[in-house]
Regions:
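Extended, hydrophobic alpha-helical segments in both membrane/secreted and soluble proteins
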Residues: 108, 112-125, 319, 331, ...
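Short amphipathic alpha-helical interaction patches enriched in hydrophobic/aromatic residues
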Residues: 5-9, 217-220, 412-415
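Helix-enriched interaction subdomains in cytosolic or periplasmic regions
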Residues: 273-275, 409-453
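Thiamine diphosphate
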Residues: 59-91, 101-105, 131-267, 279-326, ...
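Cofactor-binding active-site loop characterized by glycine-rich and histidine/acidic residues
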Residues: 3, 11-132, 306-307, 311-312, ...
Length: 595
C-alpha cells in the first residue's frame, strides 16, 4: 500500500490505520452477501486488496485503473458509492431495511470515522436507524482525525469514551478470575457469554448511565483496540449476535506502521507522490491556487478586523492554515458540515462581519439550500472561495468541480468570478469582499499558475484581444483560457484570423460584452464546467435574446468524468490547446453545427 501510494498519490494515513479492522471485518462478515458500506472511502484500500483487486492495485487512481473510493461498478464487494462524507449510516440503513423486506438475514455494515460524525447527515441516519430492529452494524473507526484535527463538542465526547479502558479487556479479566474459581466459576462465565447484558454494560457510562448511541436506540460495544485482531473479531461476532442495530467503537492510530504518517497524519491524509524513505512529497504544495488564496486572505484580514475565515474540515486543503496560525479568533473550522458552514457564515454576516468560506467545489454542492435561503433571500454578504473548481484529476467522478456554476447561476443576484491566474485571483478576492453584495463567489482550480497569455491587462471583468478584421470570436474563462490563448496564437500564426475574449467575472454577464460580440459571424465558447447550465449556455442565450445572426458553438464537459491526470482529462474531453485547434478548424472547414 505504501509503495503504491508513494507512486500514485492517494489517501494513505487513514488506510494504514484501518488495516487490522478491515481484515477483521472480512473474517467475520461474508461479503458480498453481507453489505459493507465505507464512509468517504478513504479507508477502503485494504478492502480492495482483500476483494480480488490485488493484481490491479498498482493502477489505483490512474486512468482506466481502480478507483481510490468504493465503486459498485468496479466490484460486487463495493456495496455503495463513496467519496463524500457522512453518508454511510443512511445508505447502510436503507440496505438493511431492503434486506428485511426481502426476508434476507444478512448484515449491513457501515464503516465510518469519527470525522464523519461532524457532519449532520450521519445524525439523521443514526436518529432514524437506532430503533429499527434491523441487522445494521455501525463500526466507528475513531482516530481523532478526519483530514485535520477533529473539532467540536462531539469530538471531545468521543475522546472521553476513547480514553476509557476497552470492555473486552475488562471482560477477559473477569472471565479469567471466574474460570479459576472452584465449582461456580465456569457456569457463571457460560451465563455471561450467552447473555445480551454482558460485562460491557458496566465498563463505560456517563452520568445519565448511557452513551449517545444507546440514547438513539443502538446497542453500544467498545471502545476496542483497532489494531488487535483477536479483540476486533470477538467484538464483531458479539455485534452480529444481537440482530439489532449495534455501534462498535474502535480506537485506531491514523498512519499506523509508517512513521512519517503517524507523525504527520494530516499531511498523509491525501498526499501526492512522495519519497518512501523520507516521507517528503515530490512536489511542494507551497505554490498553488489554494495557498495563494489563503495568503491573500490573511493579508486582507490583517488590515480588516471584520474579515473571518470559515472552513469545513479543510484548513490545509484550502490554504487557510496561514490565517489559522495568525488570527485564531477569526478562524472557524466547523467540521465536515458544509450546510452549517454557510448558515454560520450568514450569521456572522448579519452582524457586520465579512465571512469567507473556503470550500471545494464538489463539497459546496451539499449547501445549495442554505445559499438560497439563508444568504441570498436573507440578504447577507458572504464570500465563497470555491477551490478545486473544474477538473481535479485522480479522485474521479465524486470530486470533479463541474457543477458549482449550474447551481450558483440559478441563484438570483449571485456574482461569480473565475480568475485565470494568481494575480487575477487576488484581484477577484478583493473585489468580492469589498465591492459585491450578497453572495459573491471566486472559483479557482487545483494546480499552479498559467503563464502563456499576456498579463499586462488583468482585471476583474473581461479582456478582449482583437485583430479588427476577424469574423471569429473565441471565448473562455478560468484555467483553460490559457489553453485557448495558446490555440489563438497558433491559429493566427497560421493566418486563421480570430479574436479572443477572456471572461473574469463570468456571472452575471455584462451587457457590453454581449453587444460587442454580436458583430461576429462565428463564436466558439470553451469552458471547464458542465456544459448543461454552464456559462456558455447563458452566453448563447443572451446572444439569441439580442437577435444574434451568426453561428454559436460551445465546448464543455458532458457527463461524469472518470479519474486520470488533469492533463489527460483535458485532452480526452477536448479542452487542451491541440484539441481546441482541431475543433476550431473543423468548424471553419466543415461548418460543424454543434451547440
Amino acid at each position: 500500500m505504501i509503495d503504491t501510494v508513494s507512486k500514485n498519490g492517494g489517501h494513505l494515513a487513514s488506510n494504514l490505520g484501518a488495516v487490522e479492522l478491515t481484515m477483521a471485518i472480512h473474517r467475520v462478515f461474508n461479503s458480498p452477501e453481507d453489505k459493507i458500506v465505507w464512509d468517504v472511502g478513504h479507508q477502503s484500500y485494504t478492502h480492495k486488496l482483500l476483494t480480488g483487486r490485488l493484481d490491479r492495485f498498482s493502477t489505483i487512481r490512474k486512468e482506466d485503473g481502480i478507483s481510490g473510493f468504493t465503486k459498485p461498478e468496479e466490484s460486487l464487494h463495493d456495496a455503495f458509492i463513496s467519496g463524500h462524507s457522512s453518508t454511510s449510516v443512511s445508505a447502510a440503513y436503507g440496505i438493511a431495511q431492503a434486506m428485511k423486506i426481502d426476508g434476507n438475514e444478512n448484515y449491513a455494515v457501515a464503516v465510518t470515522g469519527d470525522g464523519a460524525l461532524t457532519g449532520g447527515l450521519i445524525y439523521e441516519g443514526l436518529n432514524n436507524a437506532g430503533k429499527s430492529n434491523t441487522n445494521l452494524i455501525i463500526i466507528l473507526n475513531h482516530n481523532d482525525m478526519s483530514i485535520s484535527k477533529n473539532v467540536g463538542a462531539l469530538a471531545k465526547y468521543l475522546l472521553s469514551i476513547r480514553n476509557k479502558r476497552g470492555y473486552l479487556k475488562t471482560k477477559r479479566a473477569v472471565e479469567k478470575v471466574l474460570t479459576n474459581t472452584p465449582v461456580v466459576g465456569k457456569p457463571i462465565v457460560k451465563v455471561l457469554k450467552t447473555s445480551k447484558d454482558t460485562v460491557k454494560n458496566t465498563v463505560y457510562r456517563k452520568s445519565n448511565n448511557t452513551t449517545i448511541f444507546e440514547d438513539l436506540g443502538f446497542i453500544y460495544l467498545g471502545p476496542v483496540d483497532g489494531h488487535n485482531l483477536e479483540d476486533l473479531e470477538e467484538v464483531l461476532y458479539t455485534a452480529k449476535s444481537y440482530h439489532k442495530p449495534v455501534v462498535v467503537h474502535v480506537n485506531t492510530v491514523k498512519g499506523k506502521g509508517y512513521a512519517p504518517a503517524e507523525k504527520n497524519p494530516g499531511e498523509f491524509h491525501g498526499i501526492s507522490k512522495f519519497d518512501i524513505m523520507t516521507g517528503n512529497p515530490e512536489v511542494s504544495s507551497d505554490d498553488c491556487y489554494s495557498t495563494v488564496f489563503g495568503r491573500e486572505l490573511l493579508k486582507l484580514a490583517l488590515k480588516d478586523q471584520k474579515i473571518c475565515a470559515v472552513t469545513a474540515a479543510m484548513k490545509y486543503g484550502t490554504g487557510l492554515q496561514y490565517f489559522s496560525n495568525q488570527l485564531k479568533d477569526r478562524f472557524f473550522d466547523v467540521g465536515i458540515a458544509e450546510q452549517h458552514a454557510v448558515t454560520f457564515s450568514a450569521g456572522l454576516a448579519s452582524m457586520g462581519k465579512i465571512p469567507v468560506f473556503a470550500v471545494y467545489s464538489s463539497f459546496l454542492q451539499r449547501a445549495i439550500d442554505q445559499l438560497i435561503h439563508d444568504v441570498t433571500i436573507g440578504k447577507n454578504h458572504i464570500v465563497l472561495g470555491i477551490d478545486r473548481a473544474g477538473i481535479v484529476g485522480e479522485d474521479g467522478e465524486t470530486h470533479q468541480g463541474l457543477y458549482d456554476i449550474p447551481l450558483l447561476t440559478a441563484i438570483p443576484n449571485a456574482e461569480i468570478y473565475s480568475p485565470a491566474c494568481y494575480e487575477e485571483l487576488k484581484m477577484c478576492l478583493n473585489e468580492a469582499i469589498y465591492k459585491c453584495q450578497g453572495l459573491a463567489c471566486v472559483r479557482y482550480p487545483k494546480g499552479n499558475d498559467c503563464t502563456s497569455f499576456n498579463k499586462s491587462d488583468l482585471n476583474t471583468s473581461y479582456t478582449f484581444t482583437e485583430n479588427h478584421c476577424s469574423d471569429l470570436l473565441l471565448v473562455s474563462y478560468g484555467r483553460i483560457y490559457d489553453e485557448l490563448y495558446k490555440a489563438y496564437v497558433l491559429l493566427n500564426n497560421e493566418n486563421v484570423k480570430c479574436d479572443i475574449l477572456k471572461l473574469t467575472k463570468i456571472f452575471p454577464l455584462e451587457n457590453y460584452i454581449i453587444q460587442k460580440s454580436l458583430k461576429y459571424k462565428k463564436i466558439i465558447f470553451f469552458e471547464e464546467s458542465s456544459v448543461s447550465g454552464g456559462i456558455s449556455q447563458i452566453f448563447g442565450n443572451e446572444l439569441l435574446l439580442k437577435n444574434f445572426s451568426g453561428n454559436y458553438y460551445s465546448k464543455g464537459v458532458k457527463g461524469f468524468v472518470k479519474q486520470a491526470t488533469i492533463k489527460s482529462i483535458l485532452e480526452r474531453i477536448g479542452l487542451d490547446c491541440d484539441s481546441m485547434v482541431v475543433y476550431i478548424k473543423n468548424i471553419l472547414e466543415n461548418d460543424i453545427n454543434e451547440t
